[in-house]
């Protein structure tokens, strides 16, 4: 039915452009609630900017559903693909399309952002039109990163995320966060600008006629050139996704950011980009023994280190951040082990981490709304006071620590299985990280929920409102549903990960010494 | 070279005699006798002056620039003595060694040489004024420099038409051209007049002797000088006067050329020709020297602002416009097929007559020719009074006496004032 | 002859550069700059003996420019003097980073 | 080249020598007998007040600047004036005469442009009052 | 004896310049009949500056039209090849006129506040841009010198044009002295080149150099001195020391003019001399220019980091931009040149816009705005803050939100990496430097958005003209940032359409191959 409307022709461009358009509308037409509250000014006309933003994001989510709908599970290659002529002189087209890898990301993003906004409705109450506009721009960038097939368009989308995030964190974040957000931008920028050089070099090597990934995948490169380009790409993505040791900006930025921004920072955009671009474009470099083992070791270190550091945190938000760092390690591990299971596991982990992190940050935000702090020392015994909250927190935390039956388990399990087949030692070490994860997860739950109510203020905290309940129930339902029925994603990611591995093995740049990967499982 | 020594000697003698001539002329104009003690008819007066100057004590005012004070007279003296070297004095002289140009240094860029060297003289005056540490002297030096540079432009521009006709900067060629076409004073009357006025100003002679206006500045830049140093300034001034006269003669009155005949211009050259042309040249030059002195004892001195405004707002535009007119006219005559000859000159003369008429009626309007007082109509008098009133009011305003004090004149940097 | 002129020109230019580097008086700096230009003029004239009239034309143009520059420089230095009462550049301190 | 200017150089040397001689002789023949009163600058008998080298009217600077600018215009006009006839002829001249019908307005046009620019500057200076001395 | 050079050909070749200078002189005459100072009617006289500035803008548009027509006609340069008639000249002319028009608007805006400018300032600006246009077309060292001086003399005056301001006077004297000295170097270089080659025409110089087995020391020292002089003019490190002081002291519109348009013209002539004239000697100057570019990028960005004074910051940033542009000259082929043109378009728009904002927040005070002045701008004038962010991001080279700035860097990087001898290291230096530059540009952004408005800071107000300038610049940057093809098409045409008089001896690109055999 959807196909008959030709929806696949316009849905992806719409997903990319609608938020930008909506951003302008929200900025111009939205009403700033805080001004009404302060009574400084006569309420300007128009609806509440937050409502407008949410509506726009809801439209975006609907579009994502449409994409999901038109996606052919058995199809090969790009789906819902659209090519819009753009810069003829560079050979750049606005080429959009999804496959099994990006589809989950698109849907995840399109749902998580509005939920996060709804869940942190009162987190931001000042200058909401601008806030909404920036959030929409950011959404456009996020979606763009997942659906663009042209490297120039991808780079534009990639950088489009930067400034809105910077402003969201800096302006609406806790006081004195401009430094943290600046650090985030600078870190990211160094990486992405190096990537820009690599993109141009790659394009140049491909004859300077096209920036489309399909074209560039066919470009044969010298090992040396591959290595440099891969390192440039990897630098950009690793910084963005906060791989240890490039992770230092993440906890600072996330803990300072307004909830929505923290959620978007937690989305594993970089990890996706590594799977999508860095590995298939430069397989020989990625599978080079030194490079690969270094990254694998780094990943494992990230898993363990993230978990260990998370254990030592005294602030709930920072625990979430470090757990996210730890997850990223697993995703990287899965990506670079590059077996069908591990890649699928990585995809699952990206999704699970996205959902769980969102849920946790929303919960932290709810705490913060109520008590203006998220330090463990301020809380305790909330289980009795806030039952809804507690349930949501426990489920989310269990998913984070990969309890079977939650989505988190699926991802980690697949990654670890895949890794075990290739690198048993690494798998074992990484598994220890999972155990540490249990420790920090339980510790957080215990410190927040189960000790005595030792602070007067905590006794009278209101439980989740209807709005908050709706958001948390949705997220928890997603975690549990995907935990028991991961098929919905795995089925779609299967072909894509196969294709990825094939392109690595048989592409023009395939490594001469193949990694010991068994295709038949 | 012999030529240098001979001509230099003659030159110095002429200068010396000129001081006497000037005084004699002044006496004549004023109906008195002039110097008559030293020698017969005062003929040895210059010698007496010279000896006196050598013996006279020199004062050394407590100035900061002792060396500049000493060098300044030399700086005025040297260029004055150099300029005349390029002026052709007569038709070439046949000698056993071939034809010899009757100029000390017959350089091909004679005209430029005169312009260049004569403008160096201003350094002497400025430095004299500066190093004297005397307010009169400083002001005199400044005035002379401002005046000389102002009129140098008018002078330069007024000679361009000559170049237009001659097509060369060699003074000899200019003389030759006039021999062929007739004197430039006919074809370029206005240029001649502007040149003459500028020449007066350049030599700091009355009516433009503001730098040494004795009624205002005692003696101007050489107030503090005495003895031979003073004498050197004096020599320089007279030397310049001769040079300028000779230049006028050369550029506008045919130089050593004899009018109405080609006899003197064509080979073979003989000693007789040289002598005759030399005399012709000397007569022409002498006439202009006479004019210089005549004017000195006839006309009153200009006011300084009148002087500057004459130079900048009348001489310069007139000279500029004249260049354009002559350029157009000569091109037009060429287009009409008039060959360069007497007819050409006549045509230009006609043009000049028209131009002079225009100049006198339209441009002058009673400013130059007749004294303003003779022409002021009652209504104009009223206007002038009102203007004077306005000026004094403004002056008061500037002093802050009147409330509506306006700013200093914007647009140009105005500071101090004297 | 040309070589000598070039050497003189180079020396004059060098004097100008050294003056520019070592002096702080605006007038002297200005004079040094003019000296540099005129040193170059000398070079041009010398080279013109080899290569024809182009150098002379260039010299006239440089002179023009130098004249305009001189007029301008004088005006600017006067302005400086009016504002600061000095032409010593090291006393000019309104612009500090 | 050098031969043409040799007389000038000789004359220059001669004149400089003369100047030095005059200054030197007069320096030797006289005996300075300075007294304090004799040494003070002559200002019509009034004791001088302050240094002579005070600030003087900016007008003098202005004239200097204008001179520099306008004098250079003359520098351009001289070569133009000298070559005017050649510039007015579209083909090389024959015996100093331009062949009939070959007159060109190139030289005149160039100079008119030049003069026009000069006049604009002149009018500007004039209207700004830089030429009036008050 | 006007041999072969008919007056008509000269007229045709120089028509835009003549139009512009003629118009400028008319404006000058108009300005002189404006009462000022203590003359009666001086109050209306102040108005006149604004009127004249607007006329200047119109004049720029007219001349721009003439340029477009000339380009469309395929107008050639002068027959003797001393003035180019190629696309590069016309394109640079257009950029210069754009910058001049915008600067005139800025002038008008600033004048509304401070009344600091006399009525002749617009015509000064136009005369400066006449000089720049001469530079854009100069194919003869004589014209180069003439253009440089025509431009510089007017800009010296412009720097000191606020006569009430001591800062302005100081800027003028510093600019003047350094400018005069750099002219000296430039000229000496020209003299030595003339001495070595016997001509001042770039074409002759190229032919001479191509015919030599070894290049004489005279020639090379000429090139070196020329390089130094040009480096002074474009403010490349280490010859940049005058820049911050001069930019700081000069009136804001003039600073904008200097940092965008003057730089454009200087780079145009730099490129023409280096690429067209001295390409044969490329192996010899290449290394020097390489280091110049690298050092300039680093120095500009590093020194900008510590500035609180926004104008000084932009001054250092303009030094850094000079470094980026030098990269395109080092690349030296058609791609590099078109990248240069694209870059200056983007840079002009961003600079003019940014200075428009600075003029607005400065409110006519006689001092440079600092970070404190712009702090919390977002709270009072959100759109202004957004526009400023766009401009800063364009400087930085951020895609989408920085608009054209990104593609400007992209094209330079592309040219650098595509060149026959790829400049990979310079490209990396460039991007790292850009990343560093983000620190200070974002410091301004963060001041605007993340700091409270200081007490007592007045709410800036704009004139409609300035407002439209800022808006236009920002929108143009954004639009062409998503679809840069028109501008790039223009830039590309500029470097591929050559006039009949273009140098056949040195087609671009092949030059390098020829010189590869030149022994060092």
Curated annotation (Swiss-Prot), chain C:
Alphabetically list the UniProt keywords.
Cell inner membrane, Cell membrane, Membrane, NAD, Quinone, Translocase, Transmembrane, Transmembrane helix, Transport, Ubiquinone
Q: Looking at the keywords, is Translocase present?
A: yes
Reactions that this protein is recorded to catalyse: a quinone + NADH + 5 H(+)(in) = a quinol + NAD(+) + 4 H(+)(out)
Where it sits in the cell: the answer is: Cell inner membrane
GO cellular component terms? NADH dehydrogenase complex; plasma membrane
Leader sequence segment = none
First-tier enzyme category under EC: translocase
List the InterPro entries hit by this protein, alphabetically. NADH_UbQ_OxRdtase_chain4L/K, NUOK/Mnh_C1-like
What Gene Ontology terms for biological process does this UniProt record contain? Answer: ATP synthesis coupled electron transport
The EC number of this protein is 7.1.1.-
Q: Where are the transmembrane segments?
A: 1-21, 27-47, 58-78
Q: What does this protein do?
A: NDH-1 shuttles electrons from NADH, via FMN and iron-sulfur (Fe-S) centers, to quinones in the respiratory chain. The immediate electron acceptor for the enzyme in this species is believed to be ubiquinone. Couples the redox reaction to proton translocation (for every two electrons transferred, four hydrogen ions are translocated across the cytoplasmic membrane), and thus conserves the redox energy in a proton gradient.
Subunit organization: NDH-1 is composed of 14 different subunits. Subunits NuoA, H, J, K, L, M, N constitute the membrane sector of the complex.
Protein family per UniProt = Belongs to the complex I subunit 4L family.
Q: What is the name attached to this protein's record?
A: NADH-quinone oxidoreductase subunit K
Native organism: Gemmatimonas aurantiaca (strain DSM 14586 / JCM 11422 / NBRC 100505 / T-27)
* Lineage, top ranks: Bacteria, Pseudomonadati, Gemmatimonadota, Gemmatimonadia, Gemmatimonadales
Curated annotation (Swiss-Prot), chain E:
Q: What class of enzyme is it?
A: translocase
Q: How does it sit in the membrane?
A: Multi-pass membrane protein
Give the span(s) annotated as Disordered: 494-520
Naming one, the record's GO cellular component terms include: plasma membrane
> Where in or outside the cell is it found?
Cell inner membrane
Give me any GO biological process, just one.
Answer: ATP synthesis coupled electron transport
Membrane-spanning residues: 13-33, 55-75, 87-107, 115-135, 141-161, 176-196, 219-239, 250-270, 285-305, 313-333, 339-359, 383-403, 425-445, 468-488
Q: Which UniProt keywords apply?
A: Cell inner membrane, Cell membrane, Membrane, NAD, Quinone, Translocase, Transmembrane, Transmembrane helix, Transport, Ubiquinone
Q: List the Gene Ontology MF annotations in alphabetical order.
A: NADH dehydrogenase (ubiquinone) activity; NADH:ubiquinone reductase (non-electrogenic) activity; quinone binding
Q: Give the compositionally biased regions (Low complexity).
A: 494-508
InterPro entries, from UniProt? NADH-Q_OxRdtase_suN/2, ND/Mrp_TM
| Reactions it catalyzes | a quinone + NADH + 5 H(+)(in) = a quinol + NAD(+) + 4 H(+)(out)
Subunit info here reads:
NDH-1 is composed of 14 different subunits. Subunits NuoA, H, J, K, L, M, N constitute the membrane sector of the complex.
PANTHER family per the record?
A: NADH DEHYDROGENASE
NCBIfam families linked: NDH_I_N
Q: What does this protein do?
A: NDH-1 shuttles electrons from NADH, via FMN and iron-sulfur (Fe-S) centers, to quinones in the respiratory chain. The immediate electron acceptor for the enzyme in this species is believed to be ubiquinone. Couples the redox reaction to proton translocation (for every two electrons transferred, four hydrogen ions are translocated across the cytoplasmic membrane), and thus conserves the redox energy in a proton gradient.
Task: Tell me its family.
Answer: Belongs to the complex I subunit 2 family.
Mind telling me what this protein is named? Answer: NADH-quinone oxidoreductase subunit N
Q: Which organism is it from?
A: Gemmatimonas aurantiaca (strain DSM 14586 / JCM 11422 / NBRC 100505 / T-27)
Highest classification ranks of the organism:
Bacteria, Pseudomonadati, Gemmatimonadota, Gemmatimonadia, Gemmatimonadales
| Gene of this entry | nuoN
């Amino acid at each position: 039915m959807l196909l008959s409307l030709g929806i696949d022709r316009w849905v992806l461009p719409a997903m990319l452009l609608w938020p930008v358009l909506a951003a302008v509308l929200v900025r111009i037409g939205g009403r700033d609630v805080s001004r009404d509250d302060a009574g400084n000014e006569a309420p300007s006309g128009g609806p509440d900017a937050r409502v407008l933003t949410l509506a726009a994001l809801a439209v975006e989510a609907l579009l994502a559903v449409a994409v999901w709908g038109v996606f052919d599970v058995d199809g090969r290659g790009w789906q819902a693909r659209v090519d819009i002529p753009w810069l003829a002189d560079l050979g750049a087209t606005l080429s959009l399309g999804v496959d099994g890898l990006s589809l989950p990301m698109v849907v995840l993003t399109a749902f998580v952002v509005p939920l996060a906004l709804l869940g942190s409705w009162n987190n931001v109450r000042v200058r909401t039109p601008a806030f909404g506009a920036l959030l929409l721009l950011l959404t456009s960038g996020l979606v763009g990163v997942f659906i663009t097939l042209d490297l120039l368009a991808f780079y534009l989308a990639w950088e489009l995320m930067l400034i809105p995030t910077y402003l969201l964190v800096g302006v609406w974040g806790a006081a004195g966060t401009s430094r943290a957000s600046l650090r985030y931008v600078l870190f990211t920028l160094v990486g992405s600008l190096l990537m820009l050089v690599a993109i141009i070099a790659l394009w140049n090597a491909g004859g300077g006629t096209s920036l489309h990934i399909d074209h560039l995948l066919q470009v044969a490169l010298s090992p040396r050139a591959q290595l440099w380009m891969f390192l440039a790409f990897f630098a950009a993505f690793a910084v963005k996704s906060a791989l240890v040791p490039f992770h230092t900006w993440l906890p600072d930025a996330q803990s300072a950011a307004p909830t929505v921004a923290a959620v978007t920072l937690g989305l594993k955009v970089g990890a996706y980009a590594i799977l999508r671009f860095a590995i298939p474009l430069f397989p020989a470099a990625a599978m080079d023994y030194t490079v690969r083992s270094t990254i694998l070791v780094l990943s494992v270190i990230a898993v363990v280190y993230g978990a260990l550091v998370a254990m030592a945190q005294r602030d709930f938000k920072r625990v979430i951040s470090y757990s996210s760092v730890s997850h990223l390690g697993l995703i990287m591990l899965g990506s670079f082990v590059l077996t069908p299971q591990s890649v699928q596991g990585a995809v699952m982990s990206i999704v699970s981490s996205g959902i769980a992190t969102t849920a946790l940050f929303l919960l932290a935000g709810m705490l913060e709304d109520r008590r203006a702090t998220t330090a463990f020392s301020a809380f305790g015994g909330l289980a009795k006071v806030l039952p809804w909250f507690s349930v949501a927190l426990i489920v989310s935390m269990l998913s984070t620590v990969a309890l079977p039956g939650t989505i988190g388990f699926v991802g980690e399990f697949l990654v670890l299985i895949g890794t075990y087949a290739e690198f048993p030692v690494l798998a074992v070490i990484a598994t220890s990280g999972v155990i540490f994860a249990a420790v920090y997860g339980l510790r957080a739950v215990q410190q927040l929920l189960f000790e005595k109510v030792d602070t007067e203020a905590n006794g009278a905290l209101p439980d989740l409102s209807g709005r908050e309940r709706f958001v948390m129930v949705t997220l928890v339902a997603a975690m549990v549903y995907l935990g028991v029925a991961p098929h919905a994603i795995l089925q779609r990611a299967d072909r894509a990960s196969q294709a990825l591995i094939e392109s690595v093995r048989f592409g023009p740049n395939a490594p001469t010494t193949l990694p010991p990967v068994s295709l038949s499982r | 070279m012999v030529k240098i020594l001979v001509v230099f000697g003659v030159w110095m003698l002429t200068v010396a005699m000129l001081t006497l001539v000037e005084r004699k002329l002044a006496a004549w104009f004023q109906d008195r006798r002039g110097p008559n003690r030293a020698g017969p008819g005062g003929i040895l007066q210059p010698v007496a002056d010279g000896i006196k100057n050598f013996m006279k004590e020199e004062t050394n005012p407590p100035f900061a620039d002792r060396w500049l004070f000493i060098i300044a007279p030399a700086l005025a003296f040297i260029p004055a003595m150099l300029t005349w070297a390029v002026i052709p004095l007569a038709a070439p002289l046949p000698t056993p060694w071939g034809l010899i140009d009757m100029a000390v240094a017959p350089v091909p860029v004679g005209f430029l040489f005169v312009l260049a060297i004569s403008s160096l003289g201003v350094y002497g005056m400025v430095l004299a004024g500066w190093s004297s540490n005397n307010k009169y002297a400083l002001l005199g030096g400044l005035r002379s420099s401002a005046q000389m540079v102002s009129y140098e432009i008018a002078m330069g521009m007024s000679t361009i038409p000559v170049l237009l006709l001659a097509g060369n900067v060699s003074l000899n060629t200019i003389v030759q051209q006039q021999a062929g076409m007739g004197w430039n004073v006919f074809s370029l009357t206005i240029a001649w007049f502007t040149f003459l006025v500028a020449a007066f100003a350049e030599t700091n002679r009355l009516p433009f002797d503001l730098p040494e206006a004795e009624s205002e500045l005692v003696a101007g830049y050489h107030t503090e000088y005495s003895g031979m140093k003073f004498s050197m300034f004096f020599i320089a001034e007279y030397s310049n006067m001769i040079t300028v006269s000779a230049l006028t003669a050369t550029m506008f009155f045919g130089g050593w050329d004899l009018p109405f005949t080609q006899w003197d211009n064509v080979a073979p050259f003989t000693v007789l020709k040289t002598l005759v042309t030399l005399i012709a040249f000397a007569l022409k030059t002498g006439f202009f020297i006479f004019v210089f002195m005549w004017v000195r004892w006839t006309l009153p001195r200009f006011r300084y602002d009148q002087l500057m405004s004459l130079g900048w707002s009348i001489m310069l535009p007139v000279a500029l416009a004249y260049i354009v007119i002559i350029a157009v006219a000569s091109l037009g005559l060429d287009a009409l097929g008039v060959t360069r000859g007497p007819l050409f000159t006549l045509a230009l003369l006609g043009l000049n007559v028209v131009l002079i008429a225009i100049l006198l009626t339209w441009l002058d309007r009673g400013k130059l020719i007749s004294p303003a007082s003779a022409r002021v109509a009652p209504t104009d008098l009223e206007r002038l009074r009102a203007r004077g009133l306005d000026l004094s009011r403004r002056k008061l305003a500037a002093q802050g006496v009147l409330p509506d004090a306006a700013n200093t004149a914007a647009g140009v940097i105005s500071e101090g004032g004297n | 002859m040309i070589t000598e002129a070039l050497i003189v020109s180079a020396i004059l230019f060098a004097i100008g550069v050294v003056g520019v580097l070592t002096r702080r008086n605006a007038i002297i700096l200005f004079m040094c700059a003019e000296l540099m230009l005129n040193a170059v003029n000398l070079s041009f004239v010398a080279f013109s003996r080899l290569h024809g009239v182009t150098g002379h034309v260039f010299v006239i143009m440089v002179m023009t420019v130098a004249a305009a520059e001189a007029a301008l420089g004088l005006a600017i230095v006067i302005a400086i003097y009016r504002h600061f009462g000095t032409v010593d550049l090291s006393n000019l301190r309104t612009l500090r980073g | 080249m050098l031969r043409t200017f040799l007389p000038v150089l000789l004359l220059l040397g001669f004149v400089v020598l003369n100047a030095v001689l005059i200054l030197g002789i007069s320096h030797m023949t006289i005996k300075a007998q300075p007294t304090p009163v004799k040494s003070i600058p002559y200002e019509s008998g009034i004791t001088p007040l302050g240094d002579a080298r005070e600030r003087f009217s900016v007008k003098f600077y202005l004239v200097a600047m204008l001179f520099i600018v306008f004098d250079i215009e003359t520098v351009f006009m001289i070569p133009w004036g000298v070559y005017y006839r050649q510039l007015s002829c579209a083909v090389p001249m024959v015996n100093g005469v331009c062949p009939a019908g070959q007159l060109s307005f190139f030289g005149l046009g160039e100079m008119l442009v030049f003069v026009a620019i000069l006049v604009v500057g002149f009018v500007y200076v004039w209207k700004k009052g830089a030429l009036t001395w008050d | 004896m006007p041999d072969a050079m008919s007056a008509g050909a000269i007229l045709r070749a120089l028509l835009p310049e003549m139009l512009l200078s003629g118009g400028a002189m008319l404006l000058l005459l108009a300005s002189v009949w404006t009462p000022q100072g203590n003359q009666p009617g001086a109050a209306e006289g102040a108005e006149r500056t604004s009127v004249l500035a607007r006329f200047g803008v119109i004049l720029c548009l007219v001349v721009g039209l003439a340029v477009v027509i000339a380009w469309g006609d395929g107008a050639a340069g002068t027959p003797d090849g001393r003035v180019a008639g190629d696309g590069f000249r016309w394109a640079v002319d257009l950029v210069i006129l754009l910058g001049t028009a915008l600067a005139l608007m800025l002038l008008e805006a600033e004048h509304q506040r401070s009344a600091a400018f006399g009525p002749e300032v617009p015509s000064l600006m136009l005369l400066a841009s006449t000089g720049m246009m001469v530079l854009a077309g100069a194919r003869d060292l004589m014209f180069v010198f003439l253009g440089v001086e025509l431009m510089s003399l007017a800009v010296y005056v412009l720097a000191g044009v606020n006569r009430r301001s001591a800062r302005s006077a100081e800027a003028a004297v510093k600019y003047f002295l350094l400018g005069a000295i750099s002219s000296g170097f430039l000229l000496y270089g020209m003299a030595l080149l003339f001495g070595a080659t016997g001509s001042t025409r770039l074409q002759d110089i190229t032919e001479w150099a191509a015919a030599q087995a070894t290049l004489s020391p005279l020639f090379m020292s000429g090139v070196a001195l020329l390089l130094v002089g040009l480096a002074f003019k474009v403010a490349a490190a280490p010859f940049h020391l005058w820049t911050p002081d001069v930019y700081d002291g000069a009136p804001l519109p003039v600073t904008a003019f200097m940092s965008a348009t003057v730089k454009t013209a200087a780079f145009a002539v730099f490129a023409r001399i280096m690429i067209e004239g001295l390409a044969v000697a490329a192996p010899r100057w290449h290394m020097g220019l390489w280091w110049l570019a690298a050092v300039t990028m680093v120095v500009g960005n590093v020194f900008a980091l510590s500035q609180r004074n926004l104008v000084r910051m932009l001054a250092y940033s303009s030094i850094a931009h000079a470094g980026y542009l030098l990269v395109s000259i080092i690349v030296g082929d058609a791609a590099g040149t078109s990248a240069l043109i694209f870059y200056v378009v983007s840079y002009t728009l961003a600079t003019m816009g940014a200075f428009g904002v600075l003029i607005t927040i400065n409110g006519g005070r006689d001092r440079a705005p600092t970070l404190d002045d712009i702090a919390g701008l977002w709270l009072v004038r959100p759109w202004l803050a957004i526009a400023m962010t766009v401009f800063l991001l364009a400087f930085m080279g951020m895609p989408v939100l920085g608009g054209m700035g990104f593609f400007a860097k992209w094209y330079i990087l592309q040219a650098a990496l595509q060149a026959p001898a790829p400049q990979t290291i310079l490209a990396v230096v460039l991007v790292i430097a850009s990343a560093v530059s983000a620190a200070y540009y974002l410091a301004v952004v963060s001041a605007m958005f993340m700091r409270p408005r200081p007490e007592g800071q007045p709410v800036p107000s704009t004139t409609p003209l300035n407002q439209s300038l800022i808006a236009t610049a920002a929108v143009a940057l954004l639009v062409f940032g998503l679809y840069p093809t028109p501008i790039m098409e223009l830039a590309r045409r500029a470097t591929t359409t050559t006039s009949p008089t273009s140098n056949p001896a040195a087609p671009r690109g092949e030059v390098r191959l020829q010189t590869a055999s030149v022994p060092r």
